[in-house]
Regions:
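Structural preference for solvent-exposed beta-strand-turn elements
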Residues: 1-164
Length: 166
């Protein structure tokens, strides 16, 4: 589906170095950069109205040694991001943000990210996914502990790619 959220995510990934082509009818061709291969983007990454894109992309870049600023539309800039910033900081990632942890947020990825064990205080597929994506670039095992299950789309995708073991 070529929704605004999907287009914003594709544009963000292209700015990080991926090559993405929409071939129509929901078919996309993606040439990735590999784990640790994100490049420094030339511009701010605009996630439009997609909180999922903002949170997952912040997770993905949090363990890459690059600096990225994320923003969004007026609605997204009113939504708090602290629930994802707290665990990502444990990787060694630094953030510059306003007092209430809303977009725009500048992410300085860790040069040598450390693996983490993080217990989710409340169920959140977005926070869990951000941590898992960040963990891909941290040397060692990153673990997310859930007291109550949340959606597992990211785990299924990573397992299908043989990137994690559940």
């Amino acid at each position: 589906m070529e929704s605004e959220d999907v287009i914003c995510t594709a544009n963000a990934l292209e700015s990080l170095g991926a090559k993405i082509v929409c071939k129509g009818s929901g078919l996309w061709s993606i040439q990735g950069v590999g784990i640790g291969g994100f490049r420094q983007p030339d511009n701010i990454i605009d996630c439009g109205n997609s909180g999922t894109s903002a949170r997952l992309l912040m997770g993905a870049v949090s363990t890459s040694f690059i600096n990225v600023t994320f923003t969004g539309d007026n609605s997204l800039r009113k939504r708090p991001m602290d629930r994802v910033l707290i665990p990502l900081a444990e990787f060694g990632t630094s953030f510059s943000t306003n007092v209430d942890n809303k977009l725009p947020i500048h992410v300085s990825g860790s040069e040598e990210p450390i693996p983490i064990i993080y217990k989710l205080p409340v169920p959140s597929a977005q926070v869990k996914s951000a941590i898992l994506l960040g963990g891909l670039n941290a040397r060692g095992r990153t673990t997310v502990v859930e007291t109550e299950a949340s959606r597992d789309h990211t785990e299924k995708m990573l397992k299908a790619l043989s990137l994690i073991h559940i």
